[in-house]
């Protein structure tokens, strides 16, 4: 008798995606982060659902409803901190996942890569709107500052900002719609993930060598299911250490003060995962220029496939490109640090230099190094 997983219409799809999927035999632990992102999404949807049962999207009660969740709801504190720190884990995995794609040349699978960029933007939008919901000082002022950036768009900017706000300032209407969007977007993300996987399974996974894996494939289960479970275990250990020992480590103390439109916090800053983009935004004195640089800091990923000049897909055997990749990584760490610092000397100058280096590395230096490495192949 034929196995049910190979004949049942629904199980057949699951089988071809997660069980009998032919996978390259040599993919390293850097390939674990796709499944870890799936786990993060599941954690966020489940914890978010339970939080939504007790949260009220109203300016007068939002802050106290979050306090109520932490104090009065059974295990509410752990659900809330799992959700808040789960977002940090989500972005940590996202950045590593994108970095792996850049390092090993996965961006040559253009459909998968482009859906991935859309996913990155969607997750960033979801996280931003989620940060507004507790209605603390940083929630309110973060929402005010970031939504205000749209006013830099010529002619229609101000109209767009007021349209998003639902009035003339961030208020009840803004909070209500942000909650609605924050609730629906994870399900849109789930649909996009399915499209992402659909395109990935059309071409098959890349591997560290960047060569075709057709000659040597192994079934996904049990080899990579076990490997992914080990990665998941590490992720959960890290998440639980954060949640149980220092749940507020990555948060902002200002968000424990209820939102007050009459009192601006001394330093308005987003969560750590947005700091690199925030530093790029602040390093340009012109408002429109800053907004364009902010968008381009992420959108530049879409240009990377067009800038590829190398004859080798992976960076595994390209020492110059490897050095430049790790310089780019260090530059992103510097930008993240600068984003959390006040706007004063020497941080302004460091931020500007790091921002210039970021764009120069991706647009000019790395493609040039690839051309050089092509020449070296002939030596």
From Swiss-Prot:
Subcellular location: Mitochondrion inner membrane
GO cellular component terms attached to this protein's record: mitochondrial inner membrane; respiratory chain complex III
Chain sites annotated for binding a ubiquinone: 201
Keyword flag Translocase: no
Spans through the membrane: 33-53, 77-98, 113-133, 178-198, 226-246, 288-308, 320-340, 347-367
UniProt keyword list: Electron transport, Heme, Iron, Membrane, Metal-binding, Mitochondrion, Mitochondrion inner membrane, Respiratory chain, Transmembrane, Transmembrane helix, Transport, Ubiquinone
Residues holding heme b b562: 83, 182
GO biological process, any: mitochondrial electron transport, ubiquinol to cytochrome c
GO molecular function: metal ion binding; ubiquinol-cytochrome-c reductase activity
Cofactor binding, note field: Binds 2 heme b groups non-covalently.
Needed cofactors: heme b
Membrane topology recorded in Swiss-Prot or TrEMBL: Multi-pass membrane protein
Gene3D superfamilies xref list: Cytochrome Bc1 Complex, Chain C
Complex and partners: The cytochrome bc1 complex contains 11 subunits: 3 respiratory subunits (MT-CYB, CYC1 and UQCRFS1), 2 core proteins (UQCRC1 and UQCRC2) and 6 low-molecular weight proteins (UQCRH/QCR6, UQCRB/QCR7, UQCRQ/QCR8, UQCR10/QCR9, UQCR11/QCR10 and a cleavage product of UQCRFS1). This cytochrome bc1 complex then forms a dimer.
PANTHER family: CYTOCHROME B
Function per UniProt: Component of the ubiquinol-cytochrome c reductase complex (complex III or cytochrome b-c1 complex) that is part of the mitochondrial respiratory chain. The b-c1 complex mediates electron transfer from ubiquinol to cytochrome c. Contributes to the generation of a proton gradient across the mitochondrial membrane that is then used for ATP synthesis.
Other notes: Heme 1 (or BL or b562) is low-potential and absorbs at about 562 nm, and heme 2 (or BH or b566) is high-potential and absorbs at about 566 nm.
Protein known as: Cytochrome b
Organism: Cheirogaleus major
